[in-house]
Amino acid sequence: MSQHDPVSAAWRAHRAYLVDLAFRMVGDIGVAEDMVQEAFSRLLRAPVGDIDDERGWLIVVTSRLCLDHIKSASTRRERPQDIAAWHDGDASVSSVDPADRVTLDDEVRLALLIMLERLGPAERVVFVLHEIFGLPYQQIATTIGSQASTCRQLAHRARRKINESRIAASVEPAQHRVVTRAFIEACSNGDLDTLLEVLDPGVAGEIDARKGVVVVGADRVGPTILRHWSHPATVLVAQPVCGQPAVLAFVNRALAGVLALSIEAGKITKIHVLVQPSTLDPLRAELGGG
């Protein structure tokens, strides 16, 4: 058990982050979970003491598994469902600055996934790792077994394709990403202290699935959130919806709820949980969540 205990700790520390990363790449919660589980299986088999940066190692393995999956799906011409049907009409062209970067708006639309489908496998992985998760090209090069210069070229091509596709693609502000990920990791680990750090003291939330009932105050909202959404069968991933930071909650790989977050000055000020079937059914059909 001496080797299993550190892996269990790694699972608690990194699983939520890795599932979020994998979901951004493959667009299917079931596949994302499988990729992360396989990465941890390989960590369990890795020689003790050979890994200096545990999260970095897991990012590399998970990303390579996702890349292999995307390549395999492309070969079989199996592409995820077109989720743009659920959220259409907001297409716009991002302007490009002199460095030829996509000028990304203030939020991520669900259309991000369908936009990524227009990229080749390597382009997709590089774009997600660099533009969304902020990893440097040198680290990405290690991940995909290439050179940093090649990764820059892949990113350049990806940004060109995104602009040419005329699909609205935007990345939520960096602060929103940090807060949302901290929220997810706290919930995934049942860590009330960390959750309270990202909640505004006066946070208000409709979070108990009873319409019109609002809970106010971090000391009440935090425990209620954990009671409903911190379970072994629950997987949370960041996926802004309709222009608002949000978290998708999957239970046994089926979409069970959408937690819409209002974030101000680095704190969550409002949480609205959507669990009505009429709201979730269209998303379930499009996100591969059952």
Swiss-Prot record:
Whether Heme counts among this entry's keywords is no
Q: What GO terms in the biological process aspect are recorded for it?
A: DNA-templated transcription initiation; response to cold
Motif Polymerase core binding: where in chain? 34-37
Region annotated Sigma-70 factor domain-4_2 sits at 110-162
Q: Does the keyword ATP-binding apply?
A: no
A Pfam family cross-referenced in the UniProt record is Sigma70_r2
Where the record puts its DNA-binding region(s)?
A: 137-156
Recount the UniProt induction comment for this entry. Constitutively expressed at a low level under all conditions tested. Transcribed under control of SigJ.
Question: What keyword terms does UniProt attach to this protein?
Answer: DNA-binding, Sigma factor, Transcription, Transcription regulation
* Entry-linked InterPro entries: ECF_Sigma-70_Domain, NTF2-like_dom_sf, RNA_pol_sigma-70_dom, RNA_pol_sigma70_r2, RNA_pol_sigma70_r4_t2, RNA_pol_sigma_r2, RNA_pol_sigma_r3/r4-like, WH-like_DNA-bd_sf
- GO MF term list: DNA binding; sigma factor activity
User: What assembly does the database describe for this protein?
Assistant: Interacts transiently with the RNA polymerase catalytic core formed by RpoA, RpoB, RpoC and RpoZ (2 alpha, 1 beta, 1 beta' and 1 omega subunit) to form the RNA polymerase holoenzyme that can initiate transcription.
Q: Tell me, what does this protein do in biology?
A: Sigma factors are initiation factors that promote the attachment of RNA polymerase to specific initiation sites and are then released. Extracytoplasmic function (ECF) sigma factors are held in an inactive form by a cognate anti-sigma factor until released, although no anti-sigma factor is known for this protein.
Q: Provide the domain comment.
A: The sigma-70 factor domain-2 mediates sequence-specific interaction with the -10 element in promoter DNA, and plays an important role in melting the double-stranded DNA and the formation of the transcription bubble. The sigma-70 factor domain-2 mediates interaction with the RNA polymerase subunits RpoB and RpoC.
| PANTHER family, alphabetized | ECF RNA POLYMERASE SIGMA FACTOR SIGI-RELATED (PTHR30173:SF43), SIGMA 19 FACTOR (PTHR30173)
Family the UniProt entry places it in: Belongs to the sigma-70 factor family. ECF subfamily.
Protein name from the UniProt record: Probable ECF RNA polymerase sigma factor SigI
Q: Which organism is it from?
A: Mycobacterium tuberculosis (strain ATCC 25618 / H37Rv)
